[in-house]
Amino acid sequence: MDIKNMRNVIVSLSLVFGLLFTVSGIIEIIIGLYSILGFKIELPLFVGDVFGGLALLAVGIAYFLGVKKAVDRDIKAVSYLFTASIIGLGIGVIAFLILISDAIGFLLGFEDWADWGFFNDLTVYLVLGMLAIIPYRIAKIISSSTT
């Protein structure tokens, strides 16, 4: 399988996930900035972390750079898809570890976690991190079939 034949797949995946990560990052940054200014905005899945939003934005930009490479028919397009997916997975793993640690605190009966629930830790980081498995697996298949 040649990278030129997979161009549409790479462009589509990179565009979709680039938009998901970029829009989520921008929303996260906006909510975080408003909370710094004293305004409280609550959206499901979003916690208002400015630096987390910047991380999501960086992953989205990496996906978009992959789109540019794929449109130019450059073999490096798979690398951008692969790298952005790995970073997205890393963000998801960190969110999952936070969920696990909070669950342990709840199960051990710690006072700070008395009112904890699973949906308290279900964040955009966890959702996007788990979704990043899709382009990761596809990029892995593409890279193994082009060698």
Curated annotation (Swiss-Prot):
It is a multi-pass membrane protein. GO terms for cellular component: plasma membrane. It is found in: Cell membrane. The chain crosses the membrane at residues 13-33, 45-65, 80-100, 116-136. Its main location: membrane. The keyword Transferase does not apply. Keywords: Cell membrane, Membrane, Transmembrane, Transmembrane helix. This is Uncharacterized protein MJ0565. It comes from Methanocaldococcus jannaschii (strain ATCC 43067 / DSM 2661 / JAL-1 / JCM 10045 / NBRC 100440) (Methanococcus jannaschii).
